[in-house]
C-alpha cells in the first residue's frame, strides 16, 4: 500500500513528464514536414501495377508549319524515348498534329500526361534534348500564355524583349537561379524544371508583363538562394532581408486648362426665375392702363433712337477731326567752343603731298630689298 506522503510526489512527476512528451511530439512533426536533402521519391515500376491499364488514353496537339522539318528529323528519337515507357507516338504531317496513346504494356498511369507535355513542348519550339527531360519523375513543365496579358502589340514586344534581356542575359540568370530551362517563343513561355523553380519562373514572367522589371525579382531570388544555405535562417522569416522596391513611375493625370470651380452643395433646389408678370408687378407697370403702357413704350423707343443718332453723328464727325501733329524739332546750333588743331591738320597735308599714291612705306621697302638680296645669293 502507498502512503499519503508518496501520492503528491507521483503527481508532480506526472506533471513534469507531460510537457516533455508534448515537446517530443512537436519535434517529430517538424521532422516529418521537412524533406531531407538529396531525398528522391522511389520510381514507379512494373511491380507496382503488373496488370497494366484497363482503357486506352490518347492526347493530340497541333504544331506550326515551321516546326515540321525539325519534328520530322527528331521523331525517331521521340518514338524511342516513349517506347521505353510503352507509349505509342504518331506524327501526321498532312494534318500537322502529334498524337500519343497508351498500349497494353503501359503500366505507369501518369506517363501519358508526361507524354502529352512532351509533344506540347516540342510544338512550342523546345528542343528534343530539353523536352525529353519531362519524362523524368522530378521534372515538370509549365507553359505560360503571355499573349493576352498586354493589349498593345508594341508594348508586348518590348516587355517580352525585356524578359529575354540583352543577348539573353536576363533569361540565363533566371535559368541559373531557378534551375529551369526557359524558352520564350511567340505568345508563350515554356519552362522545364523542378516545381519550386517553375513557381518562381511564372511569377517573374507575369510580373514582367505587368511592367515590373525582371531584375527586381532576380535580385530577391539571389538573396533567397544565399539565405537558404544558412541552416539557422531556414526556419525563420526572410521578409527583413528581402528588398522593398518603390514604384517610381506615378500616373499623372492631365489637368484641364480651364478648371471649373464647383459650387457649394445645397440640398434645396434653385430659386424659380421671375416671369414677365412678376417683373411688371415689381415695377408697377402691371396696374397701368393700355394707353399709358403704349406711351411708355413709345418714349423708350424714342430714347433709344436718340442715343443711336448721337452715336452715329459722333462717328461721322471723327473723319473731320485733324490728326495730332508731332512737335517740330529745332536744329542744333553749331557750338563755337570746339577747338580745331590747325597745326596737326597742316602736318597731315604735308605727309600726303610727299607720299605718292600706291607707294610703299619705309618698312615695306626694307623688306623688299632684303628679299631681293636673298634671291641674288641663291642664284650665285
Swiss-Prot record:
Q: What is this protein called?
A: KRR1 small subunit processome component homolog
Q: How does it assemble?
A: Part of the small subunit (SSU) processome, composed of more than 70 proteins and the RNA chaperone small nucleolar RNA (snoRNA) U3.
- Protein purpose: Part of the small subunit (SSU) processome, first precursor of the small eukaryotic ribosomal subunit. During the assembly of the SSU processome in the nucleolus, many ribosome biogenesis factors, an RNA chaperone and ribosomal proteins associate with the nascent pre-rRNA and work in concert to generate RNA folding, modifications, rearrangements and cleavage as well as targeted degradation of pre-ribosomal RNA by the RNA exosome.
Compartment annotation: Nucleus, Nucleolus
**Entry keyword set:** Isopeptide bond, Nucleus, Phosphoprotein, Ribonucleoprotein, Ribosome biogenesis, RNA-binding, rRNA processing, Ubl conjugation
Q: Which residues carry this modification: Phosphoserine?
A: 4
* Record-level GO cellular component terms: chromosome; intercellular bridge; nucleolus; nucleoplasm; small-subunit processome
Biased composition, Basic and acidic residues: where in the chain?
8-27
Q: Domain KH, which positions?
A: 153-205
Q: Which InterPro entries match?
A: KH_dom (IPR004087), KH_dom_type_1_sf (IPR036612), KRR1-like_KH1 (IPR041174), KRR1-like_KH1_euk (IPR048550), KRR1-like_KH2 (IPR048548), KRR1-like_KH2_euk (IPR048549), rRNA_assembly_KRR1 (IPR024166)
Molecular function, one GO term = RNA binding
Q: Is the Nucleus keyword given for this protein?
A: yes
Any one of the GO BP annotations? rRNA processing
Q: Does the keyword Phosphoprotein apply?
A: yes
Show the PANTHER family listed in the entry.
Answer: HIV-1 REV BINDING PROTEIN 2, 3 (PTHR12581), KRR1 SMALL SUBUNIT PROCESSOME COMPONENT HOMOLOG (PTHR12581:SF0)
Cross-link type Glycyl lysine isopeptide (Lys-Gly) (interchain with G-Cter in SUMO2), residue numbers: 23, 339, 368
Region (Disordered) location:
1-32, 249-279, 307-336
What family is it from? Belongs to the KRR1 family.
Membrane spanning residue stretches: none
Q: Which Pfam families match?
A: KH_KRR1_1st, KH_KRR1_2nd
What organism does the UniProt record list as the source?
A: Mus musculus
Q: Where is the composition biased (Basic residues)?
A: 249-261
